[in-house]
């Protein structure tokens, strides 16, 4: 097993080598619009997965996948010449889903922004169901309010026989 840091460095080198080889060595017109986005190498340095994107419809993407499979031998040979490992890793090409995920995310954000604008428009013309401030009191601030239930002033109002020994009714 190789060091994970070494595998990461090798993956970056393979990414660069494959991208350059696609531009210089491979003359397939199906591979002209390919962008290599990432590469990953297993810790034993035997297998490399290369992620790519192609802008276009499904037909263009399918053609690019076929072109990469056809050029896999040439690309592996170029990788073997430009890296310093005993065994050249096998190459696997995987279409990267980042552009698809990004466009889906942008569509969701657009829909959320539209809903927020609709809610804001409805809220602008809405009225409160009750008072604007339900905790607002009509009693002036300088008037003292007797907030407790029972105190000494209230004892004078009640007959002594109605109270028990604790002063309760």
Curated annotation (Swiss-Prot):
One of its GO terms (biological process) is maturation of SSU-rRNA. Residues 124-169 are annotated as: Disordered. Residues 140-169 have a biased composition (Acidic residues). One of several proteins that assist in the late maturation steps of the functional core of the 30S ribosomal subunit. Associates with free 30S ribosomal subunits (but not with 30S subunits that are part of 70S ribosomes or polysomes). Required for efficient processing of 16S rRNA. May interact with the 5'-terminal helix region of 16S rRNA. NCBIfam families: rbfA (TIGR00082). Belongs to the RbfA family. This is Ribosome-binding factor A. It comes from Arthrobacter sp. (strain FB24).
């Amino acid at each position: 097993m190789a060091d994970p840091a070494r595998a990461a460095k090798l993956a970056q080198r393979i990414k660069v080598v494959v991208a350059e080889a696609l531009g210089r060595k491979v003359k397939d017109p199906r591979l002209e619009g390919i962008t290599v986005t990432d590469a990953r190498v297993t810790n034993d340095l035997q297998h490399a997965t290369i992620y790519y994107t192609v802008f276009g419809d499904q037909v263009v993407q399918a053609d690019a996948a076929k072109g990469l499979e056809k050029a896999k031998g040439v690309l592996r040979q170029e990788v073997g010449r430009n890296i310093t490992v005993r065994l050249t890793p096998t190459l696997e090409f995987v279409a990267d889903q980042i552009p698809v995920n990004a466009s889906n995310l942008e569509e969701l954000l657009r829909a959320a922004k539209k809903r927020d604008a609709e809610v804001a428009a409805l809220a602008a013309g809405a009225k409160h169901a009750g008072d604007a401030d339900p905790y607002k009191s009509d009693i002036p601030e300088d008037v003292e309010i007797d907030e407790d239930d029972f105190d000494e002033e209230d004892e004078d109002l009640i007959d002594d026989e109605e109270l028990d020994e604790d002063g309760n009714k």
